[in-house]
A protein has these predicted regions:
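C-terminal motif of bacterial Sec signal peptides marking the signal peptidase cleavage site
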Residues: 24-27
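Short, well-ordered beta-strand elements
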Residues: 36-51, 68-74, 162-166, 297
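Short helix-initiation/N-cap motifs at beta->coil->alpha
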Residues: 49-50, 68-83, 193-204, 222-223
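Pocket-flanking alpha-helical
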Residues: 56, 76-112, 204, 224-230
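A conserved helix-loop-strand patch within extracytoplasmic ligand-binding domains
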Residues: 113-167
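A bilobed periplasmic-binding-protein/Venus flytrap-type ligand-binding module shared by bacterial periplasmic
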Residues: 126-136, 277-289, 313
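Flexible, solvent-exposed loop/hinge segments that line or gate ligand/substrate-binding clefts
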Residues: 183-186, 194-308
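C-terminal functional modules
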Residues: 273, 286-287, 294-296, 300-351
Length: 351
């Protein structure tokens, strides 16, 4: 007997059986593994500047949510981290600054490691700031003004005849650039760079500002400093005399002159530092063995303003590892959909 479609009952049974089998196969298709990192350890590192601790914590938390066992982060100076990365002693960090760190990469970096993701695109600016009252009183526009005796005297806190600048500790990328600036702009006899611990030095500068004394410091964004000493309200960005790049800055000269910077003494302003990408940097072999982590690094990013807010909380005293982890938990709760979408992307890659 044939049906109205012309198929025999036997053929209809065969077709239905085939369709049922296809449904079963579809339902048995492997779902993305919720924990592709299960049984695998990750060895993170983090920078020696405390404003980078939040990024390490949030990226490590994401890896934990993928099932990885994340070891305690090693605090490493930039050159030591990059050498450790190519030596396969650590797997990643979320504290890459480029092009600032270009000169600190080992010769075999491209063979062994890679910039694996961008956390903040061209959002990290750096430069020199002076309290607004002094800018107006002395007509300060650039580093060159610190060659004037009355300016040096106002910023000389130890009586050595030089203006004191809160600079960067040895091993930081900015320390090399500041040293370069003082040399090429003939400022070594006029400015004393303070290279002690940055947070403590800036706390001293903040205390001087609150006592209505002049302050002169280097900083970067995101950073708690610009929350406590706000550009245009409390302090002003000043120029370098001319664009004179370090070896690692060559090719980025145009990016060292910025327009529309809030609190700049001029517009445009010669910052002396190009705007940097904050990046995840990882070992290539680690990424090859861990496609879920690789994809996670590619899709994750953190807004600059969120990093700055967290940094401000750290400076206010919430700076223990437990408190930083709590900041991560709170951030995830406020960005749950975005967080889950990143994890879903990573899980799909590992399927």
């Amino acid at each position: 007997m044939k049906s109205r479609t012309g198929l025999s009952i036997l053929n209809r049974i065969l077709v239905l059986t085939l369709l049922f089998g296809l449904v079963l196969l579809g339902s048995c298709e492997k779902a993305p593994d919720e924990t592709p990192g299960k049984g695998k350890a990750v060895r993170p590192a983090r920078a020696t500047w405390t404003t980078g601790f939040f990024l390490e914590a949030i990226y490590s938390r994401a890896l934990e949510d993928l099932g990885y066992t994340v070891e305690d982060a090693k605090n490493l100076a930039n050159p030591i981290f990059y050498q450790s990365l190519v030596n396969d002693d650590v797997d990643f960090w979320a504290n890459g600054w480029f092009p600032l760190h270009n000169t600190q990469l080992p010769k075999n970096f491209d063979e062994k490691a890679i910039i694996a993701g961008t956390i903040v695109k061209a959002g990290a600016i750096q430069g020199y700031l002076v309290d607004k009252a002094s800018v107006e009183k002395y007509g300060i526009k650039s580093l060159d003004d610190f060659k004037r005796d009355e300016v040096k005297k106002a910023f000389d806190s130890n009586g050595d005849g030089k203006a004191d600048l809160v600079a960067c500790p040895p091993g930081w990328g900015c320390e090399k650039v500041i040293t370069h600036h003082l040399k090429v702009y003939d400022m070594e006899a006029h400015i004393n760079p303070i290279k002690a611990g940055y947070t403590a030095s800036m706390a001293d500068a903040l205390a001087r500002y609150n006592a209505k004394e002049p302050v002169f410091f280097y900083t970067w964004t995101p950073n708690w400093t610009v929350n406590r000493l706000a550009p245009d309200k409390d302090v002003m960005w000043i120029n370098v005399p001319e664009i004179n790049p370090t070896e690692g800055q060559k090719g980025f000269e145009k990016a060292m002159v910025l327009k529309g910077v809030a609190g700049a003494v001029t517009d445009p302003i010669k910052m002396g530092f190009p705007a940097n990408d904050i990046s995840v940097v990882a070992n290539k072999e680690f990424l090859k063995k861990n496609p879920a982590a690789k994809r996670l690094f590619e899709v994750m990013s953190i807004p600059l303003e969120d990093i700055a807010k967290q940094n401000n909380r750290m400076f206010a005293g919430e700076n223990s590892q437990e408190e930083i982890e709590q900041h991560v938990t709170e951030w995830i709760a406020l960005n749950k959909d975005k967080w889950e979408s990143w994890l879903a992307e990573a899980r799909k890659t590992a399927k």
